[in-house]
């Protein structure tokens, strides 16, 4: 009975589960209607959102097109503005360049040359060149102090006290470049020896911020004209360091000293490591007009050349090479024979001008000449000062002779160059006692030369 009861209960339970799993049709219908109604509403909302989005996109596109048009108009305006600015800049640049050009007529022809900015500034009254010395006047002392400060800054190896002492020394004179009202931008301090007709340039410097305007060259031209006009001085002597040699060469200075040693020896200051240089001034030249004078000389020379030659005639190109690659006889080229050309000249022109070792030898020789110990060997020994020298030394040699031989391409190999260099030192040691300055300088300079040549691998074996 219990088992029957359990089976009945199980059946009832199964039935209830079946009933619960059957869906109510009425309820389902209502839910479907609600779902369908809600679904329609959602679709409408999505369509409205898409339409609004499309309208927004169209508005954005229209706005973007308007912005692009505005940008294009703005770019066009900016481009026009930039072009106008560029044209204005070019016009200003042309005007600035024309300001530096000076022209003059000679023999019916106009000649032009470019002036340095320093010349234009002086012409416009922005700068002036003043000669000052220590006369206790307030303004001159201010200028001398400005010069002293520039020299001390630009010449750091010089003792500051030494510079101050010479600048303020009453036997020295200075020419200063002064920017108005009273700013010193550079200058030269020199000591004239009127009775000996030379002056020693002691200091020469331009402020580091003003070195691209041609002040240095214009200052030297002013100094030359001033000294010639106010004194019998016709020569300048100065000791230049390695950095100043180039500047002084451009101003007409040379390492070749034509003045007799008795004129200047013991009068000028000797600087260790400096190179003595000389400038010989021409009496009939006004150095401030040197550009115009040189251009006039060039014009006169060209005029004389045109009178006896046809080298100024410009001929049209040869038609021979237009359709042909065959060689042409040079003698048939119009104007070539008249110019004096010969086949031998062509052969000479094809030869190499310098030997393969020239650059190396030139560099080593320049280093030797600029060395502090080179002064005894710079020139050949004076026969009048040392009468027995050439009796003892049968094969004399010096650095200036080596320079002449190098320029004449006499050294065919590096061995020949080293031989002459060693000859300089060996001659010195053969003639002088080992306790002398000359003997010691020979050792120092030879040691320096050996070190320099050892730096070049292909020639290092020559000094080992």
From Swiss-Prot:
Entry-linked InterPro entries: Acyl_CoA_acyltransferase, Bromodomain, Bromodomain-like_sf, Bromodomain_CS, GCN5, GNAT_dom
Residue positions of the active site: 200
Subcellular localization: Nucleus
Gene: GCN5
Tree of life domain: Eukaryota
SUPFAM superfamilies per record: Acyl-CoA N-acyltransferases (Nat) (SSF55729), Bromodomain (SSF47370)
Molecular function GO labels: histone H3 acetyltransferase activity; histone H3K14 acetyltransferase activity; histone H3K18 acetyltransferase activity; histone H3K9 acetyltransferase activity
Protein name (Swiss-Prot/TrEMBL): Histone acetyltransferase GCN5
Family to which the UniProt record says this protein belongs: Belongs to the acetyltransferase family. GCN5 subfamily.
Ranges for domain N-acetyltransferase: 127-282
Site (Important for catalytic activity): 200
Catalytic reaction equation(s): L-lysyl-[protein] + acetyl-CoA = N(6)-acetyl-L-lysyl-[protein] + CoA + H(+)
Classification of source organism: Eukaryota, Fungi, Dikarya, Ascomycota, Saccharomycotina
Bromo domain ranges (all copies): 356-456
Binding positions for acetyl-CoA per the UniProt entry: 204-206, 211-217, 243-246
Enzymatic class: transferase
Keyword set includes Transcription: yes
GO CC annotations on file: histone acetyltransferase complex; nucleus; SAGA complex
